[in-house]
């Protein structure tokens, strides 16, 4: 089984649509059953973007059936802007949105990878950085991930550079809360230390 651990707004739909032909599964990309019910809805693939937050007991239960986990991160502020443009509530400030992402741990990549490295064999976790490994490098990324997932190929009917969902005319937004910025910086540094150390 292949399990996508995260994050949203990191090309998960694009990747899923490219590789789903390799699996005898015609269900939803994001069934959300691992987080909501503690169980799989199939034994092949789950690209729910909230899988990173599943209970530890669920992770331990399914791990024997998982061949690879995919963890894609992105510059946290860039991710937040894309997510904010898609999901913000009326009147919600960008700082408030960032606060909610930090509070729910969604952009706390250091804490997330630390937890997962303790839960499962870290060699099973494929880690990619959207900004460094995917953006502008679609061909090398798809070749690498297909090799690492032991897949026969990918859907070539749509050009690799075409995205399924793209946020156009993104505004320039900044988090002006020094405490939140410090937390984000600490998380990025922790992530780098854990994954590169």
Located regions from the model:
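PAPS-dependent sulfotransferase catalytic core
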Residues: 1-51, 87-92, 140-142, 147-195
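Short, solvent-exposed loop/turn segments at secondary-structure junctions
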Residues: 8-13, 31-33, 50-53, 74-79, ...
């Amino acid at each position: 089984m292949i399990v996508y651990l995260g994050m949203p707004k990191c090309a998960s739909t694009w990747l899923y649509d490219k590789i789903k032909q390799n699996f005898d599964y015609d269900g939803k990309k994001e069934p959300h059953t691992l987080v909501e019910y503690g169980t799989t809805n199939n034994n092949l693939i789950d690209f729910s973007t909230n899988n990173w937050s599943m209970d530890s007991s669920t992770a331990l239960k399914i791990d024997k059936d998982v061949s690879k986990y995919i963890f894609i991160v992105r510059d946290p502020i860039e991710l937040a802007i894309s997510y904010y443009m898609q999901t913000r509530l009326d009147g919600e400030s960008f700082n408030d949105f960032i606060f909610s992402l930090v509070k729910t741990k969604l952009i706390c990549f250091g804490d997330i990878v630390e937890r997962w490295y303790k839960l499962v064999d870290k060699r099973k976790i494929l880690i990619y950085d959207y900004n460094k490994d995917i953006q502008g490098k679609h061909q090398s990324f798809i070749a690498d991930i297909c090799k690492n997932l032991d897949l026969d190929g990918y859907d070539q009917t749509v050009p690799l550079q075409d995205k399924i969902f793209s946020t156009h005319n993104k505004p320039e937004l900044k988090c002006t809360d020094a405490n939140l910025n410090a937390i984000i910086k600490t998380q990025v540094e922790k992530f780098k230390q854990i994954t590169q150390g």
